[in-house]
Swiss-Prot record:
The organism's taxonomic lineage, starting at the top: Eukaryota, Metazoa, Chordata, Craniata, Vertebrata
Matches recorded under CDD domains: IlGF
The protein, known as: Insulin-like growth factor 1
Family: Belongs to the insulin family.
Protein species of origin: Panthera tigris altaica (Siberian tiger)
Keyword Transcription regulation: no
Region (A) residue spans: 90-110
Entry-linked SMART domains: IlGF
An example Gene Ontology biological process: negative regulation of apoptotic process
Length: 153
């Protein structure tokens, strides 16, 4: 049974090889060169690891990854296992001179800032109004009460 199931496979391989031979004779050497160059490019880019980022490309990548949080060029304190490391490495050392990945870039993002709680307008009026009313009352009182005149400000 093994020979019967492999017969269609062998026929396909043979026909495919014949098809390629005919196509190769039709293609010019320059076309073959460009086809080979494309194949090399696609295979090498598929196996390539993280790339290096320097200068404006590094800044653009950090802005994209970190967004509104911002980023640091040196690691903030608290990263790493020991604070006694003599040479402090930065993002340029890690991503420009060597290749780095997305996780490495995210390590240099600033932490999220907690949202500021806005004071309500009602709370501002409550705290500001008595002081203003008190000042007006004091000004009226300082003018005296001669003639029982009411002064308005």
């Amino acid at each position: 049974m093994g020979k019967i199931s492999s017969l269609p496979t062998q026929l396909f391989k043979c026909c495919f090889c014949d098809f390629l031979k005919v196509k190769m004779h039709i293609m010019s050497p320059s076309h073959l060169f460009y086809l080979g160059l494309c194949l090399l490019t696609f295979t090498s880019s598929a196996t390539a690891g993280p790339e290096t980022l320097c200068g404006a490309e590094l800044v653009d990548a950090l802005q994209f990854v970190c967004g509104d949080r911002g980023f640091y060029f040196n690691k903030p304190t608290g990263y790493g296992s020991s604070s006694r490391r003599a040479p402090q490495t930065g993002i340029v050392d890690e991503c420009c001179f060597r290749s780095c990945d997305l996780r490495r870039l995210e390590m240099y993002c600033a932490p999220l800032k907690p949202a500021k709680s806005a004071r309500s307008v009602r709370a501002q009026r409550h705290t500001d109004m008595p002081k203003a009313q008190k000042e007006v009352h004091l000004k009226n009182a300082s003018r005296g009460s001669a003639g029982n005149k009411n002064y308005r400000m």
